[in-house]
Amino acid sequence: ATNDGGVGMLQALGYDFLDKDGNQIKHGAIGLKDLVQIKDDKAIPELKDCEFHIACDVTNPLCGEQGCSVIFGPQKGATEQMIKDMEHWLADYAKIAKESFTKADADKPGTGAAGGLGFAFLTFTNATLKSGVDLILHETKLEEEIKDADIVITGEGCLDAQTAMGKAPIGVAKLAKKYGKLVLG
């Protein structure tokens, strides 16, 4: 589980996330509390030539009431205080990113996916976020199977508010509805 806004991935790609003394911040979300500057001069140069198509299963923004810390933190074991801290650190990170990287938009749908990896991809790379469920439904040609089915069972372990935020069972249910099929979670 991650909730560092994609910083760990970006550090591996050569980005510098620096504290007030010019040192790399600690790994994980806790390092964000010391972040004051982001530099890309050591980033892998080939990144500029790459296009990324990211399968994203949620539409949550990076921060706020529907952000990754508030919505997904509890399922990752975060306490209320940890959620407040991570929310604050991610908001500061987004502001710092916006100073040097014009594509930074923490409110864009999907930026809160995978603990903020969506934000990292959109801000620091040539990426587009695509609905993970739409991508999978297309690649597996599930529509052909649903058309001929009597009943559709998603196998989702728990249907909750997060399910409605773009998870696979909703995509399957919408497709089944198109053909008037009964769906069980």
Please identify what each model-predicted range represents.
Residues 59, 127, 157-161:
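Short glycine-rich anion-binding loops that position phosphate/pyrophosphate groups of nucleotides
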Residues 150-151, 157-185:
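C-terminal non-catalytic interaction/assembly regions of soluble proteins
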Residues 85-152:
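Oxyanion-binding "anion nests"
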Residues 58, 62-101:
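Acidic, glycine-rich loop-and-beta core segments that form the ion-binding/anion-interacting portion
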Residues 1-8, 117, 161-172:
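Short glycine/serine/threonine-rich phosphate/pyrophosphate-binding segments
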Residues 2-50:
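Glycine/threonine-rich beta-strand-loop-alpha-helix active-site module
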Residues 51-59, 154, 184-185:
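Short beta-strand segments
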